[in-house]
Amino acid sequence: MASAQAETNVGLASEQGPVAQRQRKGTGSGADSPKSNRSSPTQQEEKRIKSEDRTSPTGGAKDEDKESQGHAVAGGGGSSPVSSPQGRSSSVASPSSSSQQFCLRWNNYQTNLTTIFDQLLQNECFVDVTLACDGRSMKAHKMVLSACSPYFQTLLAETPCQHPIVIMRDVNWSDLKAIVEFMYRGEINVSQDQIGPLLRIAEMLKVRGLADVTHMEAATAAAAAASSERMPSSPKESTSTSRTEHDREREAEELLAFMQPEKKLRTSDWDPAELRLSPLERQQGRNVRKRRWPSADTIFNPPAPPSPLSSLIAAERMELEQKERERQRDCSLMTPPPKPPMSSGSTVGATRRLETAIHALDMPSPAATPGPLSRSSRPHSQSPQQQQAQQQGQLPLPLPLHPHHHASPAPHPSQTAGSAHHPASPAGDSRFPLGPAAAMAAARELSGLGPGPSAEPRLPPPPPHHHGGGGVGGGGVGGGGAGGVGSGGGSSLADDLEIKPGIAEMIREEERAKMMENSHAWMGATGSTLAADSYQYQLQSMWQKCWNTNQNLMHHMRFRERGPLKSWRPETMAEAIFSVLKEGLSLSQAARKYDIPYPTFVLYANRVHNMLGPSIDGGPDLRPKGRGRPQRILLGIWPDEHIKGVIKTVVFRDTKDIKDESLAAHMPPYGRHSPAFPLQDLPLSYPGASGALAGAPSSMACPNGSGPQTGVGVAGEQHMSQETAAAVAAVAHNIRQQMQMAAVPPGLFNLPPHPGVGGGVGNVPGAAGGRASISPALSSGSGPRHAPSPCGPAGLLPNLPPSMAVALHHQQQQQAAHHHMQQLHLQQQQAHLHHHQQQQQQQQQQHHQGGHQVAHKSGFGASSSSSASSSSMGQHHAPKAKSSPLRSETPRLHSPLGDLGLDMASYKREFSPSRLFAEDLAELVGASVSSSSSSAAAATAPPERSAGAASAATGADAPSSSSSGGIKVEPITTTSE
């Protein structure tokens, strides 16, 4: 700066501009020239102009004076700074100006300069310093920063770096930006709530115009003197200052004797970019031994998620670590010699001495840091020695292990004595609350998780800072002492625990990088690897494990055996198919509208179309759609009830029947789901099962199509032993699954596969009739899948879903005797009549019961199912007697269903939730809930309806099943075996 001395007047005190230039052209320093031409008119005029200017926007006369003074000194001025206007004008008068001189004035010079500087800032032209905070950075000009802040002036003067990066801690990005704008423009607009923090930071950075910088001026003067001593601009200057410097040097040497080994270090050893300088940082830096200072920041401010700057800094830091390690060996750690407590008067002197000493070492001066300076000077700032002793008294000795720097020890009484004294540690400083990062560091240190093994142990506990009047009284000296030395206890420990810094640093970086990769950066914010690994990492992995487990469970519990998860709800699918049939949307339109994958939608629509059977308008084409002709579904006309029944069967079978029937029990809406389903009560008695209960094989066969056997078995074993029942249930469950897999003949689309098919059609005709005819809903549920060919019981039975089979068997068991007889006859008849009758019944049911009948629709299944549902209901209500025994037993049976919580038996007619589903469906499909209710009614009024079914069902409960749908259950259907 000394070299720029002449310019200081020009650049900084605008009114001196032209004059200063003239002065430069003249002999040089006007103050020394005897001939200064004070009376010349021009000079008078200049004087006048100057005094006017002194009130210029930059801040009033007082500020101007301060500025010129500070800068003149900073320049190392041969010309003593004169603060009186006359002095100033005289200094500009050129001694040799015998000829008249003219003042050339640039009126809007100041505004122009301001504008230009602002433009340079915006365009980042000629920038030579980077300010960073909060992970963001902005480039600025050293000259402007120095002009506006003695803090920056000192800082940048000490940093012999082309383009230093100043990392501000505990500074908000918005505040920093505003302050820099203020320095460049002289004014900013801020909201009210921003003013407080802004002024706090301005105070910290000693920004002229926003903060009182008088305290800094003295320090700056000392700094300037020291720097001018290093690079004297003229021999005369150096001699003038040398004596005082010499004295200062001697005092400083006493102060810094304990740093002796390091005294050899010169700034060249420090890479200035490495000095991460921020006011608070430097304050805290004093706590750390000097050689450790550069990376002290890593300790106090645990690495935040890496910013572009931090990687550079880390690399440089690693090189430094090597040098530091060697240095460390030389630096014997000893506490500074105790000094008698200084009175506040001597504080400033001490400050200066310390400062110059530090300058002599080319070390960044802690004193220059604008620590919060308490205005009231301390009555007695204690010497570093005392402070450290005090601190060690306060902090238990284990502390050096993980220094809780920021946990401020209970302030020592002496500290609290002085008014406005800041508590022992910077963290405690009320005016400078820790930023989030520092707070985190404090917390981490408290919890013993240091940012890394190497950095921590090396920090001796910081001596409490006492900020005395001069700004450095006890604070500076104490800080210096602590910085260089560390407390005795801490030092030995620190050295014992030391890990080679370079290595530790590398390890830390590596861990951090690994963490960033592994944790997708969401744990990256915790600088502490330990913390992340131990807590967040575990949390995350636990969460993932749970997620995976749940996914697997979901897969297993899906109702579909294979294929990806569905992205659509069955209700949506039902609506979409219905809209194709009724609104004439094309398949692709409907798929888009309802957001169902097109191929899936075509699959379901085709299935529905196939099951709808011939269209009312007599369209001739019954063949399944040819490849690439899915749209044919649009051509037919079918009764709404019929359509809804088929849709329920096709669409809801997937979702609602666990492996078909197993879930079916839960679904009231379909026949088998309808609450009326006694079948469900008999859950495990398979049609085959009931018959099979006695003769499992034969009964199983029955469900598959040997009606007579089933019937017989059923009759015989209505009350099987639980063990048998369980065994049968298991077998039945397997068979059920197989049956589910069976192809569904298109003709059977209407069959409620379970009810009609298994029970009604062939196997358990009687039983099925009563119960086997699962409620139409049931049949509809499984119908599509199971619907066997309309032709025969055999076909039907194989398709029976397991639940259907169960239902059939239970019914069979109850009605077994009658059913056997009927089943035999009926089976034969069924083959021929069943299909037609059921279809008729289905249609009737559709009309009568809407949804319910739809369920029944399935050809043979229909009548049987309706009768079954009624009978089952009857059983539940009245006949419950029979069904309930089974039912009560069933839960005990160990069937796969039971494990799934799907025990069929458990669903009793009374179970109203079953009706809920019916209602939902009805809403969806537009069918009235009556269908389900009708089946319930049938069950309730089994005796009346049973007329047809009674004979068919011949079971006690069978009668009720006769017309659950309002359809007469024909004995054939009931017996349908």
From Swiss-Prot:
Lineage top rank: taxon: Eukaryota
GO BP annotation list: eye-antennal disc morphogenesis; female sex differentiation; leg disc morphogenesis; negative regulation of developmental pigmentation; negative regulation of male pigmentation; regulation of developmental pigmentation; regulation of DNA-templated transcription; regulation of transcription by RNA polymerase II
SUPFAM superfamilies xrefs: Homeodomain-like, POZ domain
Bias (Gly residues): 469-491
Ranges annotated as biased composition (Low complexity): 80-97, 372-396, 804-816, 838-853, 862-872, 925-966
Predominant cellular place of this UniProt entry's protein: nucleus
Skewed-composition ranges (Polar residues): 34-43
Ranges for domain HTH psq-type: 559-611
Cited Gene3D superfamilies: Potassium Channel Kv1.1, Chain A
Alphabetized GO MF terms: DNA-binding transcription factor activity; minor groove of adenine-thymine-rich DNA binding
Tissue occurrence: Leg imaginal disk at the central region of the tarsus and in eye antenna disk at the basal cylinder.
CDD domains linked: BTB_POZ_BAB-like
Record's compositionally biased regions (Basic and acidic residues): 44-69, 316-330
One cellular component (GO) term of this entry: nucleus
Swiss-Prot/TrEMBL keywords: DNA-binding, Nucleus, Transcription, Transcription regulation
SMART domains: BTB
InterPro entries found in the cross-reference section: BTB/POZ_dom, Dros_DevTransReg, Homeodomain-like_sf, HTH_Psq, SKP1/BTB/POZ_sf
TM region(s), chain numbering: none
Positions of the DNA-binding region: 569-614, 621-632
BTB domain residues: 127-192
Location within or outside the cell: Nucleus
Stretches for region Disordered: 1-97, 221-249, 281-348, 362-434, 447-497, 772-900, 925-977
Function as written in the Swiss-Prot or TrEMBL entry: Probably acts as a transcriptional regulator. Required for the specification of the tarsal segment. Also involved in antenna development.
Additional observations: 'Bric-a-brac' means 'jumble' in French (referring to the mutant ovary phenotype).
Name this polypeptide is given: Protein bric-a-brac 1
